[in-house]
Design a protein with these regions (language model features):
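Conserved glycine-rich cofactor-binding loop
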Residues: 14-15
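Substrate-binding pocket helix/loop in short-chain dehydrogenase/reductase
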Residues: 92-93, 100-105, 198
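Alpha-helical segment proximal to the catalytic Tyr-Lys
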Residues: 121, 164, 168-172
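Active-site helix of classical SDR
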Residues: 116, 155, 163
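Active-site loop of short-chain dehydrogenase/reductase
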Residues: 5-6, 77-78, 123-137, 172-175, ...
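Conserved NAD(P)H cofactor-binding loop of Rossmann-fold oxidoreductase domains
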Residues: 84-89, 236
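C-terminal substrate-recognition "lid" of short-chain dehydrogenase/reductases
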Residues: 175, 209-233, 238
């Protein structure tokens, strides 16, 4: 087990990939601040003196401010950020509404911007570098016929793009910025989806599990010479038609 006094923020930390990441970081002796709308009610998170929980909508700037302040006041630093909070739903393009778009932008983009700005400002002040890892989606690189997610992919593709831009902007400050792009992952988001259908969305004919995504997050958080990378964990779905 790695031993560290570093502090990581995990958004969308109450279940699925988020709660898996929280546990993995705790196992590696990180201090963790986890946030989601109702993270204090999560049954997937352990009780730990190294874990602080902050309820709130990450699409609101005040939530991001409270999360950053909790990290600094409780643990003294922000050394890593995992932008995991996100929403996703499919519709034909012409059925998406203006309200759908606002919801997607609020959580997927506004939340990313608010939290990442505060994390980078703190990292710059600490002068010890840092890591930012965001969860995007394989679909942003390779759409799949029958999975109508054009509007959500505006947000996920945007995060892929800003990941590369920020990696260049802050490279000399030692702040690394990367992303993990999953395909279908066995999380509560897909509880009611037919597993046979989901398996067909990958050339390997299988569904990723949370631990596989979390392993990628941990790798990118700790890899000292990797930045600007969008790491696909999708059974090959980003490659193209199969």
């Amino acid at each position: 087990m790695a031993h560290t006094s570093k502090t990581v923020i995990v958004t969308g930390g109450s279940q699925g990939i988020g709660s898996g990441a929280v546990q993995a970081f705790l196992d590696r002796d990180y201090n963790v601040v986890a946030t989601s709308r109702n993270v204090t009610k999560s049954k997937d998170l352990p009780s730990s003196r190294k874990l602080a929980l902050v309820d709130g909508d990450i699409g609101e700037a005040t939530t991001a401010a409270r999360v950053a302040e909790t990290a600094i006041s409780t643990f003294g630093s922000i050394d890593a950020l995992v932008n995991n909070a996100g929403i996703f739903f499919t519709k034909p393009f012409t059925d998406y509404t203006a309200e759908d778009f606002k919801r997607l932008v609020s959580t997927n983009l506004d939340g990313f911007i608010y939290m990442t700005q505060l994390a980078i400002k703190q990292m710059l002040g600490q002068k010890s570098g840092g890591s930012i890892v965001s969860i995007t989606a394989s679909l942003a690189d390779n759409p799949i016929a029958g999975v109508n997610a054009s509007i959500p992919m505006i947000t996920k593709g945007g995060i892929n793009a800003i990941t590369r831009s920020l990696a260049i902007e802050y490279a000399k400050d030692g702040i690394r910025v990367n992303a993990v792009a999953p395909g279908v992952v066995d999380t509560p988001m897909h509880t009611n989806s037919p597993k046979d259908f989901l398996k067909r969305l990958s050339p390997m004919g299988s569904i990723s599990n949370v631990h596989e995504i979390v392993d990628a997050v941990i790798y990118l958080t700790e890899a000292p010479h990797v930045t600007g990378e969008v790491l696909h964990v999708d059974g090959g779905a980003h490659i193209g038609k199969w």
